[in-house]
Amino acid sequence: MTTAQAVGAVSSEATQWYAIDWPTINRNVRRLQVRIAQATKEGSWGKVRALQRLLTHSYSGKVLAVRRVTENTGKKTPGVDQEIWNTPEKKVQAVQALKRRGYQPQPLRRVYIPKSDGKTMRPLGIPTMKDRAQQALYLLALDPVVETTADKNSYGFRPQRSCADAIEQCFLALKSAKTAWILEGDIKSCFDRISHNWLLAHVPMDRAILQKWLKSGYMEKHVFHETTDGTPQGGIISPALSNCALDGLERLLKEKYPTGTRLRSLGGKYPSVNLIRYADDFVITGKTKELLEGEIKPLVEQFLRARGLELSPTKTIVTHVTQGFDFLGQNVRRYSNGKLLIKPSKKSVKHFLAGIRETIKAALGKSATDLINELNPKIRGWANYHRHVVSKRMFNRVDYSIFYKLWQWARRRHPNKDPRWLKQKYFERHRGRDWFFFGETWDEEGQPTKVRMLLASRIPIKRHVKVRSEANPYDPVYETYFEKREENHMLDTFRGTRTLRFLWYEQCGLCPACNTKITRITGWRLHHCVPRVMGGSRSVENRVLLHPECHNRVHDQRIAVSKPRLPSGGVRRA
């Protein structure tokens, strides 16, 4: 054993991984993605294929793909080979092994997870780490094409888009009293039935690689099963493939029913046809029930049939907006006073409270602090999801239901104690509100402190600003737009506000472009020194605050802005 080995010296491969210049890697990949998007926009498909090949064979692309699969939530979940890449040495070896020639994917490992109803199970196919990295690599080259050609109002599994955008588009499409009917579309086993032949003929990527993935099969209980159709849920590239299959439906409807064109069949009225899709869930608005059932539904069925898909006859229904419908966990309905309101759906509330009850029921032997630490992330996640709609009354009901279950938990935990003792032990008055559930713990310095239950009703309700339907994160034209959205998102979160304050202190309150004060009156804009479309990171090392006018000038004149020098004595974190 050498001296270096004895003291645990870092290997050459580990040194190689730690020495990677990630800003340069991101910049190289982003530049190619921007060029791919531009070539797609121009319809230069030969150039698209050449640039995709350049990206999938590049060192930067391979390194970024390996980093993605070793840093995401599934990094500790192995495939059929039971291998995970948890050391720098394995990551470097993985980069070197990512080659097209001789590549043969292994079967997927089939597992089952419960669906939202809690009764049925959803199959997932888990690829090996190598296959995941290969998919991540080819997704880097496919995603700019998919984003450029995607339907404008498709919101699922796309960068810079969310469920909140889809819900807000529902409101925009239905707020007019002229739009009264909705087709609720449900595609039967969408991911499991997409035609392989259609995907191979239409997905703009290396077809030989795609065919190997589609035909790789899966292992279940040590038995190999072939796959003849569908894209496995669990693969990194699967959401992009399903979006490829379903994109085009909105364009088809717009060609058939152009905006601003009256229909004779409707007595010269506008059809008011709009599609809002999130993955395989979609709704289509229309003027009349007859239009949706007699014309649009057959058109959708024909579109899906070519892709090996079909609508579920029992779950695909036409509903009047006054009856309301559920979409992505929200209920959309126009009430008798003419107002269109979106609220958390009863199903979503019931499912959430059932999970809370199970957590509390299983925590009889835990302390109040441990229980709060389990419940708070669940409450925060559910409330943040619904905080963009009319949720205040439902949040209060949820708070009461949780309080009632916590009181039962306290009584079961201390059956011989009277209610006054229980209240003093677990509940207190805080911020003007009584009966705040709390637990006692110690901070890092060993001092006693309290943790408190999060109340859903304390989450502020704020209207979501929908992303522009045509905005493309791979198009430099929208760089300023996405910077502004990110700034608004930061201001909307406690952590983000701290970051803005830190940047302000770091710059001594000065704009680096004009060297004058940034104040609330002057306003500010968040700027990336290295643009995001060129691979710049979101870290504070790549961000500065500029005046709005200075920000416009920097982008218009393409002026380079660098980070200001730190003030003497460093920067205090806000």
Please name every model-derived segment.
Residues V66-V69, V95-K119, M129, A133-L142, ...:
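Reverse-transcriptase-like RNA-dependent polymerase core
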Residues N515-P548, V554-R565:
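Histidine-centered nuclease catalytic patch
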Residues D399-R495:
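Extended C-terminal regions of large enzymes
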Residues A97, T149-N153, R158-R161, D165-G324:
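Conserved polymerase palm-domain catalytic core
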Residues A471-A513, S537, K563-A574:
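Short, charged surface segments at domain edges that flank catalytic/cofactor-binding sites
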Residues T15-G74, L140-G156, K563:
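Charged boundary/loop elements
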Residues K215, F224, R307-W382:
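A conserved non-catalytic segment of reverse transcriptases
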